[in-house]
């Protein structure tokens, strides 16, 4: 790592949230933050459980998990699987969806009388084009309802402190839990 190389209070490691032995070696923390990645592990519920196991009593867990939209989520799961299946799938999905995304963004720019391409990077931290490819390539792709995440963590001794939902749409439901 190039940051804090000689800092004795800064440790950088590489590990998997699915590796229980690695997780058990880390200890407990006041804050555990996993924003929009646990649903890309292929074992989302195990990943959530392992992340939660790192939170000490009275500690806080911040997670963001893709909202389950039923058929729409199933559709995107198929699209993403095809995109990640190899070069043919990647080209096919790119040829279908990137023009669709571009047209949608151009229409939005015209209706809002704003350049959504320029505004996007300021608000999201990445270019809109990069985000489109990031969305298409986000595999594995798992989803959960607000209720499922709430009950799963409630059963593990967590209280919901705050929530921001995707309002039933595409995107992440964002949760803040406190361990009792």
Question: What spans do the regions from the language model cover?
Answer:
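Conserved beta-strand signature within the Rossmann-like core of class I S-adenosyl-L-methionine
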Residues: 58-66
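Core SAM-dependent methyltransferase catalytic element
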Residues: 156-180
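Residues lining the SAM
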Residues: 35-38, 64
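Conserved SAM-binding strand-loop segment of SAM-dependent methyltransferases
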Residues: 5-20
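A short, conserved alpha-helix within the catalytic core of class I
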Residues: 41-51
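Substrate-binding/catalytic lobe of Class I Rossmann-like enzymes that use SAM or dcSAM, i.e.
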Residues: 75-159
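A short acidic, Gly/Pro-enriched loop at the edge of an enzyme's catalytic core
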Residues: 18-32
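Conserved SAM-binding loop
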Residues: 1
């Amino acid at each position: 790592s190039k940051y804090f190389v000689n800092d004795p209070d800064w440790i950088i490691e590489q590990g998997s949230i699915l590796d229980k032995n690695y997780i058990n070696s880390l200890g407990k923390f006041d804050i555990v933050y996993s924003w929009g990645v646990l649903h890309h592990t292929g074992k989302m519920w195990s990943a959530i459980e392992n992340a939660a196991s790192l939170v000490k009593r009275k500690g806080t867990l911040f997670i963001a998990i893709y909202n389950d939209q039923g058929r729409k989520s199933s559709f995107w799961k198929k699209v993403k699987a095809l995109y990640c299946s190899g070069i043919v799938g990647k080209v096919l999905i790119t040829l279908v969806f990137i023009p669709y995304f571009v047209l949608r963004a151009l229409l939005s720019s015209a209706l809002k009388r704003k350049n959504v391409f320029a505004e996007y990077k300021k608000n999201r931290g990445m270019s809109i084009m990069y985000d489109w490819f990031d969305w298409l390539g986000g595999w594995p792709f798992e989803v959960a309802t607000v209720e499922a995440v709430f009950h799963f963590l409630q059963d593990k001794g967590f209280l919901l402190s705050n929530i921001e939902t995707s309002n039933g749409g595409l995107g992440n439901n964002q949760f803040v839990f406190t361990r009792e």
